[in-house]
């Protein structure tokens, strides 16, 4: 029996096809002595047991090599006073510590009561390389909790840039969680757990889920993720393994004259950027590469051979090789002045179905960390205003936040230095 596909081409029946596959498999020798390996696109058996340290000077999820799955969730805080806010931060610390290190799922002693765990990971909650990074927004420092004098000096409410089309429902938040793991199941489980434990303290404001390719995640930072415009995203990132450089670029330090509690934290800029992918896919390759300033396949700056080659703008003052308004040239002109605007990018792609106009709703969850929001993201974005890429991208949400310093030990909790001032 045969079937026809949508083009009228005859296809063999499923039974005959499977029989043929079985015969082919039977004729192939099997190397039983070889070590079993994970198939491409799947995680190794040990990946579920990967874990990141929870205690330390800084929160995990900032310098951590990017995991495959990610979620941004902004919340409004429902706490009634400062004591309630402390209860929230202590509770979040406890949940983050357990979820990131793994353990047996709690049993429900009375079946007449709701289960203590969602159960979506089964009886054992594997760490799965989970990190949950807590950041606070400008609005947390209003009159509710008496924290205004302790607000980080550069923290501010995100305002509109010329190309923005911001949706108020997708902006800002008292707190923001960046949840990352090897698999989306673990990310979803973590969110469910946190919401279950904080019904009187937190209310979800907005949420977006992101991803990078599994092979990029498995490279542990050695392979640059590719965004949904088909270009490598994050090539020019500073080396996150260079502690001295991270002190200069990412972490707030004592010499910045910030409130003392902020030392060890970082300013976080979040932008939800929608791509016009159908329009982009109809754009000639040469124009795409001119807009970015890079070769689409290799990621190399135009006129160069390798992804991490450093462009020499001094030898191309008129932009004949790399256009003056190209993305990479505007974002980082590589001058002495632009050294102060370095930041660590940690972006993810998103795909949400279709818009009301029938266009694919795809884009970028842009996240970056820096020790100074004004010198970092804000300065870079001002340079990018009017770039050629704006025709294909539209920022629709996000916000500016401050990622809290880390938790020193089991007696400490996130935000303790802020709340005990």
From Swiss-Prot:
Region ranges (Disordered): 32-51
Listed GO biological process terms: iron import into cell
Pfam family for this entry, one: Dyp_perox_N
Record has Metal-binding as a keyword: yes
UniProt remark on cofactor binding: Binds 1 heme b (iron(II)-protoporphyrin IX) group non-covalently per subunit.
Known cofactor(s): heme b
InterPro entries to which the protein is assigned, alphabetical: Dimeric_a/b-barrel (IPR011008), Dyp_perox_C (IPR048328), Dyp_perox_N (IPR048327), Dyp_peroxidase (IPR006314), EfeB/EfeN (IPR006313), TAT_signal (IPR006311)
Reaction(s) catalysed by this chain's protein: heme b + 2 H(+) = protoporphyrin IX + Fe(2+)
Record PTM: Predicted to be exported by the Tat system. The position of the signal peptide cleavage has not been experimentally proven.
GO molecular-function term, one example from the UniProt record: ferrochelatase activity
Residues of the signal peptide: 1-33
Superkingdom: Bacteria
Compartments it resides in: Periplasm
Main location: periplasm
Role this protein plays: Involved in the recovery of exogenous heme iron. Extracts iron from heme while preserving the protoporphyrin ring intact.
UniProt xrefs under PANTHER family: DEFERROCHELATASE (PTHR30521:SF4), DEFERROCHELATASE/PEROXIDASE (PTHR30521)
Name of the protein described by the UniProt record: Deferrochelatase
Species of provenance: Shigella flexneri
